[in-house]
C-alpha cells in the first residue's frame, strides 16, 4: 500500500486534496477531533510526505487524550522535518501528558530558548506547569 500513488489512482489534483484538508480543519475548529482525525489520516495516505498533515494527526491525538498515539504520530512528523517547532511543542505536551516527564522537561528546556516567542512562551508555560517546584523555605519563629 505504501508504494501506491493514491492521488494518481483517484485522478485527484491538489485542489481536491486542499478541499479535504480544509474540511478536516473545519472539524478541528468545531472541536470535532474524532471526525477531523479521519480526514487528516486520509491526507497522510494521499501525501505521506506532507509535514502539516502528519503533525496535525499528532496534535489531534493530543486533543483526544491519546498521548501514546500522539507521540508516535509526532515522531513520524519529525522524521519529515526534525526541527519543526510546532511539532516539537506538541510532542512536548504529549510527553508530559503521557507521564514521560523527564523527556518532556528536556525538550521544554530546549524549546524555551527558541527564537520564536510563541514557541518559547509555550515551553515556559509547560515548564511552569510540569517542572518540580522547589520546596518552600521554612520560616523560623523568632523567640
Regions found by a protein language model. Name each.
Residues 2-19:
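TPR-adjacent "capping" and linker segments in tetratricopeptide-repeat scaffold/adaptor proteins
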